[in-house]
């Protein structure tokens, strides 16, 4: 119960702050405040600390109420915490009343999102093209479609060190080709959060960017801060379930592709065991695992999926683990890794002698996604696309029906298996086949779906269970390797339940 959790968090916080003013509506908020202010969880606040924060609280309260905040279902503490994620306490304290009002105006969409129990709205397909009529010419609206755009891509790494960055760069070059003369793109590399990420996003905007894509979840903080400083710029971050209405987030429904590769794996397995490599227990990953297992069971009813995670400490090479168990069909990472064999990704077969044979792999058509978004901006549909969100943050989570997600099939697949995969691809793309529209039993024996209906996108994105065909578990925060914990703090399925001492900064 969130209310009970909030009560215990307040009881933990009060002895160090000794103030009743600060209240929040979201679990984890006290810990976030302490982290942002540089305080350890049990560190006693000095009288000066308390005076400083109370002064900020009253300063923000006055501006919040002047904006009509009294009618909203969020607290002054919620708004103060939001502001402190974007500005330092010194910056806030030095603002004039009019400047603070302007800052709050720029963040108002995010303030409205604070009162939502589910602050993220999932968009499952591209917006419909704008219909232009005679009145659009006689009485043009205030949101005029631009004739030319500058689009910037800010990457955490480079194409030579990251296949992920390379895929997004292919998408960027597609924009140059499709919108030649209308769109100009630029790329910025090696954006490190907490170091130069904010500066690189700012540089992109200084260089004239109208639209900025940041292609790593770790860049969401830099994206949010830039969006507040530059509300006229459209900023999108490649991540899931980020509750910030000032920016938009985007990802793909990988589980649809995993369902198809699972069916292929089941058909190609010589026995009843298949290996599966997962990276982080983040939003959407359990859905990927379950969809793969359900696809595999469709072609191999007695199959078991052996699940191995790469985010655990002292993790042995999963390929070695699987081969020691006699498992020869494996779903590996979704993209090639530097310094790894080029075929050790996607779903593959281990031949005698250790030779790897490609079977199939999920494939991202990022260019199609970027083309759809830029076309929406060019035709004036960006604001219209946002109008139905009811103050919530927008997360684009597009699937195979949008053309953004696909499955690459190996030419070495048997013809009958290729034919099956093509049927499944057509069915998933058309909506005739839903991977989760079936009876599903969890590992604990509970019925997760009766089979009379599918699961909605919110249920799929927040899935935190595994079906009964999977051997393995979803690791919790304490089990992860230290290097894996920052990503979990941002995208982990149980990130909001992290104890106080494990809270992270944005």
Name each model feature, range by range.
Residues 6, 10, 17-21, 29-37, ...:
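Extracellular/periplasmic periplasmic-binding protein-like sensory domains
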Residues 21, 37-130, 380-506:
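Segments of small-molecule ligand-sensing domains
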Residues 137-140, 151-171, 175, 179, ...:
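Extracytoplasmic "Venus flytrap"
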Residues 172, 260-303, 307, 390-412:
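An alpha-beta-alpha
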Residues 190-232, 236:
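Beta-alpha junction/loop-to-helix N-cap segments that form part of ligand/metal-binding clefts
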Residues 208-217, 236-238, 325-336, 356-364, ...:
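Periplasmic-binding protein-like
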Residues 228-251:
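Flexible loop/hinge segments that line or gate small-molecule binding clefts
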Residues 250-272, 364-384:
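Hydrophobic alpha-helical segments within soluble ligand-binding/sensing domains
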